[in-house]
A protein has these predicted regions:
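Proline- and acidic/polar-enriched loop/turn elements at helix boundaries
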Residues: 1-2, 35, 46, 165
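C-terminal, flexible cofactor-proximal segment of oxidoreductases
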Residues: 98-183
Length: 183
C-alpha cells in the first residue's frame, strides 16, 4: 500500500522506492449512470455493448465512449482487447450510432462498429508531448505542436477554436496548468 509520494520517492508500508519517474495509475470506474441500466457490465462498471454499440436487451439504447466495454473484432489496429475510454473512440462511436439510428428509421440493417485507430498523443509538460501515429513515435516540441494543431482542428467552429487557442496561449504565457484542457 502506498503511504506517500514525493518528487523522487514512493513510500510503501515497509519500504521506499526511489525513482526519477513516478506514474500513478490508480484505476478508473465508469460513470454512476451505468448503474441505472440493468445489463451486463465489466469489473469497472462499463456496459458491455453489442457490435453495433447497442445495449443487449435494450435494442433502442446505445452506449458509447468510456461508458462502454467494446471488444473490437475487425479493427485494423489489433492492439486493444477492449477499446480505451478516449475521445477518438467516443467520437467515432457517436458517428456510428447516429448512422445506426438513421438506419433504424429507414428500416436498414444495422452495421458493426469498426474502430479506426488514428494514433495516440499526450501532453507531458510545457512545450512537451508524445505522439504515436502510424508506428511513428516521437516527443518534444514538435509533438506538442502537433497535439495543439490536432486538438484545435477537432473543435467545431472558428469562434470556439479562437477562444480555446487564446486560452491556451494565455495559459502558456502565464504557466497555468489547466491551459491544455479542451472544453
Amino acid at each position: 500500500i502506498v503511504k506517500n509520494i514525493q518528487k523522487d520517492k514512493v513510500f510503501l508500508e515497509n519500504s521506499v522506492i526511489e525513482s526519477e519517474s513516478i506514474f500513478w495509475t490508480a484505476g478508473i470506474q465508469a460513470s454512476p449512470l451505468t448503474q441505472s441500466i440493468d445489463c451486463d457490465k465489466d469489473n469497472l462498471g462499463r456496459i458491455i455493448v453489442k457490435e453495433d454499440c447497442s445495449v443487449p436487451g435494450y435494442e433502442n439504447i446505445f452506449a458509447i465512449g468510456d461508458l462502454t466495454n467494446f471488444k473490437p473484432k475487425n479493427n485494423l489496429s489489433k492492439k486493444y482487447e477492449t477499446l480505451p475510454g478516449v475521445a477518438q473512440v467516443a467520437l467515432q462511436m457517436g458517428k456510428h450510432v447516429s448512422k445506426q439510428i438513421q438506419n433504424d428509421l429507414n428500416n436498414v440493417e444495422r452495421k458493426t462498429f469498426n474502430y479506426k485507430d488514428l494514433g495516440e498523443m499526450a501532453t507531458i509538460g510545457k512545450s512537451k508531448a508524445v505522439v504515436d501515429i502510424m508506428n511513428l513515435r516521437f516527443g518534444g516540441v514538435i509533438a506538442w505542436l502537433i497535439w495543439l494543431f490536432v486538438h484545435l482542428i477537432a473543435i467545431t467552429n472558428f469562434k470556439n477554436k479562437l477562444m480555446i487557442f487564446t486560452q491556451w496561449f494565455w495559459g502558456y504565457l502565464t504557466s497555468q496548468r489547466h491551459s491544455r484542457i479542451i472544453r
